[in-house]
C-alpha cells in the first residue's frame, strides 16, 4: 500500500493523506459473502449512549471473513484483493478447488494468482494457516487463535504481526504487536505473514466531514462542558479543572490508571504485560 499526499488546493485537502488503493483489484464485493450490518451507533436497547463518539456515517455491508481457516487440505487461489469498509486491512477473495469462495485477511506480499492452503502439513508460505507447533521460531504470524477451533481472535489489525519466541511443552511463546509476551496452546492455528496495509496509521483525514463519513462523532473536552455534564466543567471562562487529578466523565481517575481486571484467568498466560 502507498499513501497519496494532497496539495493545499482547498482547506479540505490541506494536510490530507489518504490511501492510494493501488492494491485493490476488484471494486464490488462477492454477493454470496456479504450480509446486512445493523450498527448500534453506540446505543443500547433503550437508546441510551453506552459508547460515545459513534453515529452517522455511510452504510456498510458486512463481509463474511473466514477467521477460522478450517477448510483443511483444500487449495485456494487468490482471485481478488478487495477493500473492506469494516476494517483497515484489505481482504483477499479465495476460490477453492471444490468451487467454494471465501474471504480471508490479506497478508502482505500475497498477490492475485497465488495459492494458499490450511492444514497440519501446510507449507511455510505467506497466507497458509497451520498450528503454532508447526511454525518455526522467529516466524511472523497473524490471525491467531486463543482457544483451539475458535478461530483467529488476535493480531488482525492492519500492518500487525506476532513473532514466535519459544516452544515449551503444550505452549508456544509469542510477542504480540503491543510488546506483550504471552503463552498460547500449540494446537492453535495462525496464518503466516503480516496483515496488509501497514501504512494505515499514516492516513490523515484532512477535514471533519470525512471523519463523519466513517461514523465518528466529535470528541468534546470536559473543560468546556457544564458541571452537570463533566467533572471538569463549569467555572468562569477557561477555568482549571478544580480537582487533584483528571477525571473521566463518570468521576473515575483518568490518565495512567490501569483498567484491566486484576483477577482474569488469562493472567496466568501473560509473561510480560504490554508496554
From Swiss-Prot:
<dbReference type="GO" id="GO:0019843">
    <property type="term" value="F:rRNA binding"/>
</dbReference>
<keyword id="KW-0689">Ribosomal protein</keyword>
<dbReference type="InterPro" id="IPR022666">
    <property type="entry name" value="Ribosomal_uL2_RNA-bd_dom"/>
</dbReference>
<dbReference type="GO" id="GO:0009507">
    <property type="term" value="C:chloroplast"/>
</dbReference>
<dbReference type="InterPro" id="IPR005880">
    <property type="entry name" value="Ribosomal_uL2_bac/org-type"/>
</dbReference>
<dbReference type="GO" id="GO:0005762">
    <property type="term" value="C:mitochondrial large ribosomal subunit"/>
</dbReference>
<dbReference type="InterPro" id="IPR008991">
    <property type="entry name" value="Translation_prot_SH3-like_sf"/>
</dbReference>
<dbReference type="InterPro" id="IPR002171">
    <property type="entry name" value="Ribosomal_uL2"/>
</dbReference>
<dbReference type="InterPro" id="IPR022669">
    <property type="entry name" value="Ribosomal_uL2_C"/>
</dbReference>
<dbReference type="InterPro" id="IPR014722">
    <property type="entry name" value="Rib_uL2_dom2"/>
</dbReference>
<dbReference type="InterPro" id="IPR012340">
    <property type="entry name" value="NA-bd_OB-fold"/>
</dbReference>
<dbReference type="GO" id="GO:0032543">
    <property type="term" value="P:mitochondrial translation"/>
</dbReference>
<feature type="region of interest" description="Disordered">
    <location>
        <begin position="219"/>
        <end position="255"/>
    </location>
</feature>
<dbReference type="Pfam" id="PF00181">
    <property type="entry name" value="Ribosomal_L2"/>
</dbReference>
<keyword id="KW-0150">Chloroplast</keyword>
<dbReference type="InterPro" id="IPR022671">
    <property type="entry name" value="Ribosomal_uL2_CS"/>
</dbReference>
<dbReference type="InterPro" id="IPR014726">
    <property type="entry name" value="Ribosomal_uL2_dom3"/>
</dbReference>
<comment type="subunit">
    <text>Part of the 50S ribosomal subunit.</text>
</comment>
<comment type="similarity">
    <text>Belongs to the universal ribosomal protein uL2 family.</text>
</comment>
<dbReference type="GO" id="GO:0016740">
    <property type="term" value="F:transferase activity"/>
</dbReference>
<dbReference type="Pfam" id="PF03947">
    <property type="entry name" value="Ribosomal_L2_C"/>
</dbReference>
<keyword id="KW-0934">Plastid</keyword>
<dbReference type="GO" id="GO:0003735">
    <property type="term" value="F:structural constituent of ribosome"/>
</dbReference>
<protein>
    <recommendedName>
        <fullName>Large ribosomal subunit protein uL2c</fullName>
    </recommendedName>
</protein>
<keyword id="KW-0687">Ribonucleoprotein</keyword>
Amino acid at each position: 500500500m502507498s499513501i497519496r499526499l494532497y496539495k493545499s488546493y482547498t482547506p479540505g485537502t490541506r494536510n490530507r493523506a489518504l490511501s492510494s488503493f493501488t492494491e485493490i483489484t476488484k471494486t464490488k464485493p462477492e454477493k454470496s459473502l456479504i450480509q446486512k450490518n445493523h450498527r448500534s451507533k453506540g446505543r443500547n436497547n433503550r437508546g441510551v449512549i453506552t459508547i460515545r463518539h459513534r453515529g452517522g456515517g455511510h452504510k456498510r455491508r458486512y463481509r463474511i471473513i473466514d477467521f477460522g481457516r478450517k477448510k483443511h487440505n483444500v487449495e485456494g487461489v487468490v482471485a481478488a484483493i478487495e477493500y473492506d469498509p469494516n476494517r483497515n486491512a484489505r481482504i483477499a477473495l479465495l476460490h477453492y478447488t471444490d468451487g467454494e469462495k471465501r474471504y480471508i485477511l490479506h497478508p502482505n506480499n500475497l498477490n492475485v494468482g497465488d495459492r494458499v492452503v490450511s492444514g497440519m502439513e501446510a507449507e511455510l508460505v505467506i497466507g497458509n494457516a497451520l498450528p503454532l507447533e508447526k511454525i518455526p521460531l522467529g516466524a511472523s504470524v497473524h490471525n491467531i487463535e486463543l482457544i483451539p477451533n475458535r478461530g483467529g481472535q488476535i493480531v488482525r489489525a492492519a500492518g500487525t504481526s506476532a513473532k514466535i519466541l519459544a516452544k515449551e511443552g503444550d505452549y508456544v511463546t509469542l510477542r504480540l504487536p503491543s510488546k506483550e509476551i504471552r503463552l498460547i496452546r500449540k494446537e492453535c492455528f495462525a496464518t503466516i505473514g503480516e496483515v496488509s496495509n501497514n501504512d494505515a496509521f499514516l492516513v490523515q483525514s484532512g477535514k471533519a466531514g470525512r471523519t463523519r463519513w466513517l461514523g465518528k462523532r466529535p470528541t468534546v473536552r470536559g473543560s468546556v462542558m457544564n458541571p452537570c455534564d463533566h467533572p471538569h466543567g463549569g467555572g468562569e471562562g477557561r477555568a482549571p479543572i478544580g480537582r487533584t487529578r483528571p477525571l473521566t466523565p463518570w468521576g473515575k481517575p483518568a490518565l495512567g490508571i490501569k483498567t484491566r481486571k486484576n483477577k482474569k484467568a488469562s493472567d496466568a498466560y501473560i509473561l510480560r504485560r504490554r508496554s
